[in-house]
């Protein structure tokens, strides 16, 4: 059973990984040609840097012991394996969680396409990979306060049950979506989107086939 669970987990991780090029193609198709390289590099870099940062720092914060944030065991998979103890190989579980983190990070890229400096996007990648995603993920998947089933816990006293997210609709997509909303609101529309009269102008993408 453990072997089958491991195979299924790695298969699911592979499918989630392919969301990364999927988002990249969607964004590249809906933007102008001059910004294609910038968007593709953002999607590549947030996966590369985000994976390394989550591996070294975020994973420990997300699955360490604690209510608000996990007590980290940085660079120590053996210690994390004893804490998580889900019957799955810790290396495979790390890969599985890493691609989820990368997906949450790359969701934001499309909402801020053509309006973000590459250097500032790298700063954002650091924050979501080592702080925002691990902390919010800890609340739901890492034993934090949202999944605390003790009789006197906040969730049990208030709702009579704990919070469940079976596939990342909140931990991954909602977190990425809220960050994207805030980023888009701060940045505002793309240059040239509105004329002096306030009317909206269409900015056609380069390829609906890619999108």
How would you describe each model-predicted region?
Residues 1-211:
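Hydrophobic alpha-helical transmembrane bundles of multi-pass membrane proteins
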């Amino acid at each position: 059973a453990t072997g089958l669970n491991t195979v299924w987990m790695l298969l699911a991780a592979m499918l989630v990984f392919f969301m990364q090029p999927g988002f990249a193609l969607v964004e590249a198709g809906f933007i102008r040609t001059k910004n294609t390289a910038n968007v593709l590099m953002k999607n590549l870099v947030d996966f590369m840097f985000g994976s390394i940062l989550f591996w070294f720092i975020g994973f420990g914060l997300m699955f360490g012991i604690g209510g608000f944030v996990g007590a980290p065991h940085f660079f120590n998979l053996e210690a994390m394996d004893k804490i998580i103890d889900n019957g799955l190989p810790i290396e495979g579980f790390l890969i599985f969680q890493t691609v989820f983190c990368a997906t949450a990070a790359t969701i934001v890229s499309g909402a801020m396409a053509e309006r973000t400096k590459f250097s500032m996007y790298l700063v954002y990648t650091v924050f979501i990979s080592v702080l925002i995603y691990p902390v919010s993920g800890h609340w739901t998947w890492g034993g934090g306060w949202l999944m605390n089933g003790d009789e006197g816990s906040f969730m049990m006293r208030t709702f009579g049950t704990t919070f469940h997210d079976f596939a990342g609709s909140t931990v991954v997509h909602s977190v990425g979506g809220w960050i994207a909303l805030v980023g888009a609101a701060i940045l505002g529309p793309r240059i040239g989107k509105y004329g002096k009269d306030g009317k909206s102008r269409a900015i056609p993408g380069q390829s609906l086939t890619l999108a």
